[in-house]
Amino acid sequence: MRLWKSMAWGILLWHSQSGALCPAWPPARAAEEITRLQQQLADWNDIYWKQGVSAVDDSVYDQLSARLVQWQRCVGQDVSSTPVSPPLNGTTMHPVAHTGVRKLADRQAVEQWMRGRSELWVQPKVDGVAVTLVYQNGKLTRAISRGNGLQGEDWTPKIRLIPSIPQTTQGALANAVLQGEIFLQREGHIQQRMGGMNARSKVAGMLMRQDNASALNSLGIFIWAWPDGPANMPERLSQLAKAGFSLTNKYTLAVKDASEVERARQSWLTSALPFVTDGVVIRMAKEPASQHWRPGQGDWLAAWKYPPVAQVAQVSAIQFSVGKSGKITVVASLVPVILDDKRVQRVNIDSVKRWEAWDIAPGDQILVSLAGQGIPRLDEVVWRSRERSKPVPPDSHFNSLTCFYASETCQEQFISRLVWLGSRSALGLDGMGEASWRALHQTHRFKHIFSWLALTSAQIANTPGFAKGKSEQIWRQFNLARRQSFTRWIMAMDIPLTQAALQASGDRSWEQLLMRTEQHWWQLPATGERRAGRVIDWRNNPQIKTLSRWLAAQHIPGFGS
């Protein structure tokens, strides 16, 4: 099916600024869109941290936050106020600040970051909620939410109720500050297959609510930092394991290069784990003294996240296509995104009715994933632009019996019919894709779907864009088509029957087909009364009758007397 190009609407123009894609909005609209998205993120953020309820999927929130930063940079706006961190509700100071972790985009960035650094280790990036645990004289005395990295909420009463978190320690850990991730315990979680499950939001919800002490039994802890702990990583891991923090020891691996990091990353992505992850963290064994830790300044560690299962993509245009049956399909053109190494720049929305129900316009942000066989799929609309400029769909008078003949209003369905008759399901014309059909039709102005049979080799060779080899191949294919069976020619005419039903009917000529009754048709495999009626309508259609006579004049098998 070909896109209804003349009906495409609202294509957004983009330009590059500092390596980022920027919408070509007037300043007033850019300011409005940024303010609206900023407010929406702030509202979601507030609900998430105050009520423990996620109004949007974690991955969607993260991607829209990144989109906001991108837009702000496009217009030269300060990005420091972007609401990507929890609101400061608590006032309990962290004894050691949470630095956060720098994100690396790809393997090349990982290689560059590792260059010049030594004694490196890799851990899974456990997806949960960050916390500080303070042990004094062998007892857990405080537990503090990450907050803004310098201070957060006092979570001590809740943390004491989590069985997997040791309440007492000894030795070097008797007086220690630990930083880690509270996570939702899973059995055999395979990240690649099961995804993130909104685990971060679920953990936050459990910690925020006041009436769910039993739910805390499902939480675990992964310690990823022991500020001022043993400088030797194996010793650090051993002591953590003896104290009851065994997961850190099990899932911390020494690495020498990016290949080993990539191997661990792929293994944890595809293996059964006790927690949800969203990538890996590479860290140096040697860390600065804890008094030098500051939010956003942890240059001794970096993360390489997994690509999201679904990507937020911006709609650049809405287009319509008309198939050979006359069905109008809506397609959203996208600012390209990468999904599982596949470049996705359009997604099928399906019918006009479904498009209207989705209420999608250029400028909207939609969530796209890959369905079976890598086909892009629309999952949801996650953000709507203020401007709702939508195209008007083409008239809906097309059906399975229209556009066998070319006309101004029939261009798209006519092209779809040509593509169909050249496919393997019909005449099997190798090398004849949509572009080739469109070039031939634009140059030679076909009258009907079989006009190409009358072309000479010279006419084909003179078609703009056709090299000598291409035109010769097309000429051969057109000549070979004349020898195809009657059944295949009938399929090319889009008879509403399967090839299996036609074979069962045994018809080998147009004359035989005309003699068949409706009862004969509905007794064929996978047909029935309704389809049999459609066959009769098709057979009696004036355009079909005219085409059958034209094919007879061309001496196509089965159509002559």
Curated annotation (Swiss-Prot):
What does the record give as the function of this protein? Catalyzes the formation of phosphodiester linkages between 5'-phosphoryl and 3'-hydroxyl groups in double-stranded DNA using NAD as a coenzyme and as the energy source for the reaction.
PANTHER family listed in its UniProt record: DNA LIGASE, DNA LIGASE B
Native organism is Salmonella gallinarum (strain 287/91 / NCTC 13346)
For this entry, the protein name equals DNA ligase B
Q: Which GO terms describe its molecular function?
A: DNA ligase (NAD+) activity
Superkingdom of this protein's organism:
Bacteria
Q: Which reaction does it catalyse?
A: NAD(+) + (deoxyribonucleotide)n-3'-hydroxyl + 5'-phospho-(deoxyribonucleotide)m = (deoxyribonucleotide)n+m + AMP + beta-nicotinamide D-nucleotide
What family name appears in the similarity comment? Belongs to the NAD-dependent DNA ligase family. LigB subfamily.
The UniProt keywords, alphabetically, are: DNA damage, DNA repair, DNA replication, Ligase, NAD
Gene3D superfamilies recorded for this chain? 5' to 3' exonuclease, C-terminal subdomain, DNA ligase/mRNA capping enzyme, Helix hairpin bin, Nucleic acid-binding proteins
- Active site located where? 125 (n6-amp-lysine intermediate)
Q: What's the EC number here?
A: 6.5.1.2
Q: Does the keyword Ribosomal protein apply?
A: no
Gene name tied to this protein: ligB
Q: What GO terms in the biological process aspect are recorded for it?
A: DNA repair; DNA replication
